[in-house]
Each structure stands twice: as structure tokens, then as C-alpha cells.
């Protein structure tokens, strides 16, 4: 924005000051409105970021739980799998 210089030395001092003050007030109001709009936009971005972070935490916890369950299944599977393998090997070896 360029500075507003409405001062005319030939005009009366009071009306010149009034015009400058009104222009300054209008410019400040415009800046204030722009700042309010930016604040609202930033609030929306912050809310969206919070929502995404919450979803990511839920996904992380879900993945951790699934990995824990898979690890438990894998820990239990070799024990029962070894028993079946031994049983199959013994029963196959007997008929031969």
C-alpha cells in the first residue's frame, strides 16, 4: 500500500485533517478486516491439522494393536505347528 498524503496547503487545515483521518480510519478498518479473515483461515487450518493428527494417532494405535496380535499368533503358531509336523512325520514313517 502506498502512503496516503491528502494534505493540500491551499485548503483549510480542518477539512484536510478530517479527510486524512477518515482515510486512515478506513485503511485501518480494511487492515483489521484482513487480519480477521486471516485469523479465521488460520483457525480452520489449525482445526484441520488437529483432526488429521487425531486420525493419525488412532491409526497408529490400531496398527500397534494389530502388530501385537500378529506377534502373539506367531509366537503360538510355531509350537502347534511343530507338534503337527512331528505327528505327521511319525505317522508317515510308520507305514513305510
UniProtKB/Swiss-Prot annotation:
Among its keywords, does the record have Lipoprotein? no
- Sorted alphabetically, which InterPro entries does this protein's record hold? BBLN_eukaryota (IPR005374)
Domain of life the protein comes from: Eukaryota
**What are the protein's UniProt keywords?**
Coiled coil
Recorded coiled-coil stretches: 21-77
The record's region (Disordered) falls at 1-28, 70-96
Could you tell me where the Acidic residues compositional bias lies?
72-85
Q: Give me the stretches of Polar residues compositional bias.
A: 8-21
The UniProt entry, under Pfam families, shows:
UPF0184
The reply to whether Ribosomal protein figures as a keyword in the UniProt entry is no
What family name appears in the similarity comment? Belongs to the UPF0184 (EST00098) family.
Q: What's the name of the protein?
A: UPF0184 protein CG14818
